[in-house]
Amino acid sequence: MKAIRFISILLILATVCCPLVACDQGDATDIDLPERDFYEVTVSFQIKDKTGRTVIEAIDYKYKSHAEPTVLNVVDTYLAVVQDWVCKIDKTNTLTQIGGMKANKNNGEYWGFVTNIETDSEGNLALNGKTAINLSLEQINRNLSDGKMCDAKVIDGAEFTLILKGTE
């Protein structure tokens, strides 16, 4: 009788425990994770001053992005390149802020979209100070003076436009 009870207990334990022990699926390194898709994005754009003169132009600039190539994502990703060019081209030590550039991201700061890029009465590149997060000119200049973008100063001005020709 004791033997039958012992065998019954063993069978119950085997039924419960064996799947747990035998269910080895291998290491985590064996799991095939799908690679993230990249989107090939092509952008052409011009930055013109208020007279219509093209100041900066890029034709068929190509890059890869994880984000879908909407105009918003294109502007957002593209900004650092444009900013770099503006800092090099603008000899008057003023700055043109264009679109959603991410500056000093590790400290949680984010530069929202600027609506009007402008030139002042002397033709210097300038900005009306309007951003999506309402940074004041003083705040922007304070961040710029730390060398996070380039040596530049934002001033008030007239009219400057960014034209995105589209994405593929």
Question: Over which residues does each language-model region extend?
Answer:
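C-terminal motif of bacterial Sec signal peptides marking the signal peptidase cleavage site
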Residues: C18-A22
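Bacterial N-terminal signal peptides that target proteins for export
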Residues: M1-I9
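Ubiquitin-like/PB1-type beta-grasp interaction modules and other compact soluble beta-rich domains
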Residues: C23-E168
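Hydrophobic helical h-region of N-terminal Sec-dependent signal peptides
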Residues: I9-V16
